[in-house]
């Protein structure tokens, strides 16, 4: 493919509105362009990368018996009313009317559509299991689109749905999808973790998220690609390294989720779902009497602890929530933070939000900072974190502004449900007892769910079982954010290319090192002087030999300065660069492997053999 015939609008500078490096590079390197807020055009390079990823997906899904189809993106609102999600999905749902004033939506996901199709076609257990998927644009009316393809209003998604007679059968397909996802993301060259996830608005029972890990900005070895003029990182002057560190730090860390994972085992979970090892305390302490004391101007845990000369751990943090419009008290030890997702899941609530201070006064008679679990009126549900039951003679709010109670003891002074509702902390022991928890930022690239009968119940999707009884179909749901993959890959494979000029000056510039399986082309063939006939003849010979061996070749045939060509090549990020320069008359070409920065001159007749050797481990 001739570069002069492609739309690759590279930029000399980073776009000023980009905050994460993946967004900046995909715009600067000519992969995408924003059409309007949260809506992007995928230019030829991005389209080729996405199509390569689709090919990987299709190959792996063929192995597990998943069948591709295509459903409409424009959906009747009646289906979503039937499932109940038309009212509950929220403001992200695009709602519209046709000329007859009938209600429609633009699909953000397709559980209802697939459930209806199967409900109308499948009547017997003998027709199951079914494993269907599609690759399609989805729509969500994001309030604040940001970070390039990571948070958009239109996006490409692979969504799959499986239909079963039993949960045992669902488990088999769920595990097959888990293995297929691992194979897909591994082939795509991604550093990822499969983690315990939250089902959120999708509904369902079990779920697993797949997160692309955002690289550590402090590890220079993984960010820098050194030119052959620089033997090692140690040869770069300290002041230059400080400039490079500042450049790395200037970009926001991408990834909307924090992942907690074990340093020694396979345990990994979204921070919203993560837990740590809990060992109940067995110490015996004489129980003090309850005493009400004045605590003037003490609104926070640390202020109360300082006033009473105790540790924050001895103070019970009391938070008031409204769960489906009913009050719930959540209790934590003072130096812990609430995990609202865990609390919501424990309660089985559809909606959970912190109460207002006005609601606190109405329900408990006091404002924030003075709330507590003692002497409550009937009907207020109390959920305490597991660690609360280890406390003795603790301090809690007296439900009277400016006052607290000392000598508070669980089970004697209040009754509560105990559950893990706290946010874990880095360095705590992993729940499996192996290693400690470490945190990383991650980009969600895939999610699989055991939906169970969530949709078949509400939409009457039943089959006749072996005994002729009508039973609901058991479902699974499996998503991959296809357009997000481009962001995740660039985030992980962005590099700073460092070189040294003949005068001894150090230069560094951003570029991409695409993994081979997703690179839009395999080889970037650059002719330094397109007006040199010998160079042109050699270019055509090399291009033909590469293509004959199955390489996808992007040939830079533009009449541009060589520096501009090399700069664009670094930005575009193809794995191999072959340059035809001053030694074209001798048949000599230069090979450069982008991932390492290594380069070598060879005769054109030996090019294919040399590439086979240089890339055999890649």
Curated annotation (Swiss-Prot):
Record's PROSITE patterns? AA_TRNA_LIGASE_II
The entry's family comment says: Belongs to the class-II aminoacyl-tRNA synthetase family. ProS type 1 subfamily.
The record's note on its domains:
Consists of three domains: the N-terminal catalytic domain, the editing domain and the C-terminal anticodon-binding domain.
Question: Lineage, please?
Answer: Bacteria, Bacillati, Bacillota, Bacilli, Lactobacillales
EC main group: ligase
What functional role does this protein have?
A: Catalyzes the attachment of proline to tRNA(Pro) in a two-step reaction: proline is first activated by ATP to form Pro-AMP and then transferred to the acceptor end of tRNA(Pro). As ProRS can inadvertently accommodate and process non-cognate amino acids such as alanine and cysteine, to avoid such errors it has two additional distinct editing activities against alanine. One activity is designated as 'pretransfer' editing and involves the tRNA(Pro)-independent hydrolysis of activated Ala-AMP.
Q: Which CDD domains match?
A: ProRS-INS, ProRS_anticodon_short
A GO molecular function held by the record: catalytic activity, acting on a protein
Keyword line? Aminoacyl-tRNA synthetase, ATP-binding, Cytoplasm, Ligase, Nucleotide-binding, Protein biosynthesis
Cystine pairs annotated here are: none
Keyword Protein biosynthesis attached: yes
EC number(s) reported in the record: 6.1.1.15
Catalytic activity reads: tRNA(Pro) + L-proline + ATP = L-prolyl-tRNA(Pro) + AMP + diphosphate
Describe, as the record does, how this protein assembles with itself and its partners: Homodimer.
Name the predominant localization.
cytoplasm
Mind telling me which GO cellular component terms the entry cites? Answer: cytosol
| Gene Ontology biological process terms from the UniProt entry | prolyl-tRNA aminoacylation
Q: Which organism is it from?
A: Streptococcus equi subsp. zooepidemicus (strain H70)
Tell me where on the tree of life, at the top rank, the source sits: Bacteria
Subcellular localization: Cytoplasm
Q: What is this protein called?
A: Proline--tRNA ligase
Q: Name one Pfam family in it.
A: tRNA_edit
Stored InterPro entries: aa-tRNA-synt_IIb (IPR002314), aa-tRNA-synth_II (IPR006195), aa-tRNA-synth_II/BPL/LPL (IPR045864), Anticodon-bd (IPR004154), Anticodon-bd_dom_sf (IPR036621), Pro-tRNA-ligase_IIa (IPR002316), Pro-tRNA-synth_IIa_bac-type (IPR004500), Pro-tRNA-Synthase_IIa_type1 (IPR023717)
């Amino acid at each position: 493919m001739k570069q002069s015939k492609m739309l690759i609008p590279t930029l000399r500078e980073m776009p000023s509105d980009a905050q994460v490096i993946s967004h900046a590079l995909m715009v600067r390197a000519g992969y995408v362009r924003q059409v309007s807020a949260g809506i992007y055009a995928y230019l030829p390079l991005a389209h080729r990368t996405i199509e390569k990823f689709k090919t990987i997906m299709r190959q792996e899904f063929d192995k597990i018996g998943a069948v591709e189809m295509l459903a409409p993106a424009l959906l009747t609102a009646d289906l979503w009313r039937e499932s109940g999600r038309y009212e509950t999905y929220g403001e992200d749902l695009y709602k519209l009317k046709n000329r007859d004033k009938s209600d429609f939506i633009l699909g953000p996901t397709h559980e209802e559509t697939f459930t209806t199709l199967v409900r109308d076609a499948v009547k017997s257990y003998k027709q199951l299991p079914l494993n269907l998927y599609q690759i399609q644009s989805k729509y969500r009316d994001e309030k604040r689109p940001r970070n390039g393809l990571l948070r958009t209003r239109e996006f490409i998604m692979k969504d799959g749905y499986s239909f079963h007679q039993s949960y045992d059968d669902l488990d088999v397909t769920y595990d097959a999808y888990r293995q297929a996802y691992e194979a897909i993301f591994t082939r795509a060259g991604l550093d990822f973790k499969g983690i315990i996830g939250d089902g959120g608005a999708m509904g369902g029972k079990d779920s697993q998220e797949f997160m692309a890990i955002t690289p550590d900005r402090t590890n220079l070895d993984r960010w820098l690609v050194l030119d052959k003029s620089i033997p090692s990182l140690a040869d770069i002057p300290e002041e230059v390294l400080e400039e490079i560190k500042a450049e790395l730090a200037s970009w926001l860390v991408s990834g909307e989720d924090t992942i907690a994972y074990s340093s020694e085992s396979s345990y990994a979970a979204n921070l919203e779902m993560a837990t740590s090892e809990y060992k109940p305390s067995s110490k015996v302490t004489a129980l003090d009497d309850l005493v009400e004391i004045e605590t003037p101007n003490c609104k926070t845990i640390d202020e109360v602890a300082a006033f009473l000369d105790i540790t924050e751990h001895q103070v019970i943090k009391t938070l008031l929530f409204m769960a489906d419009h009913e009050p719930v008290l959540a209790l934590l030890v003072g130096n812990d933070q609430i995990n609202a997702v865990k609390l919501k899941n424990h309660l089985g609530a559809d909606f959970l939000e912190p109460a207002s201070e006005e609601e606190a006064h109405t329900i408990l008679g006091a404002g924030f900072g003075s709330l507590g679990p003692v002497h409550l009126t009937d009907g207020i549900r109390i959920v305490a974190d597991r660690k609360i039951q280890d406390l003795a003679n603790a301090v809690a709010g007296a439900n009277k502004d400016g006052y607290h109670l000392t000598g508070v003891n669980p089970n004697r002074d209040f009754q509560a449900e105990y559950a893990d509702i706290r946010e874990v902390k880095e360095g705590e022991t992993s729940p499996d007892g192996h290693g400690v928890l470490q945190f990383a930022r991650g980009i969600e690239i895939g999610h699989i769910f055991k939906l169970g009968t969530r949709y078949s119940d509400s939409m009457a999707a039943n089959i006749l079982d072996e005994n002729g009884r009508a039973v609901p179909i058991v479902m699974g749901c499996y998503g991959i954010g296809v357009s997000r993959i481009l962001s995740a890959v660039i985030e992980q494979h962005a590099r700073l290319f460092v070189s040294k000029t003949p005068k001894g000056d150090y230069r560094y510039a951003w570029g991409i090192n695409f993994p081979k399986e997703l690179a839009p082309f395999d080889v970037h063939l650059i002719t330094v002087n397109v007006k040199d006939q010998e160079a042109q003849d050699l270019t055509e010979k090399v291009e033909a030999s590469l293509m004959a061996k199955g390489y996808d070749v992007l040939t830079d045939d533009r009449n541009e300065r060589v520096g501009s060509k090399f700069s664009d090549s670094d930005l575009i990020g193809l794995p191999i660069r072959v340059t035809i320069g001053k030694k074209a008359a001798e048949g000599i070409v230069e090979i450069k492997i982008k991932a390492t920065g290594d380069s070598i001159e060879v005769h054109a007749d030996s090019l294919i053999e040399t590439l086979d050797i240089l890339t055999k481990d890649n």
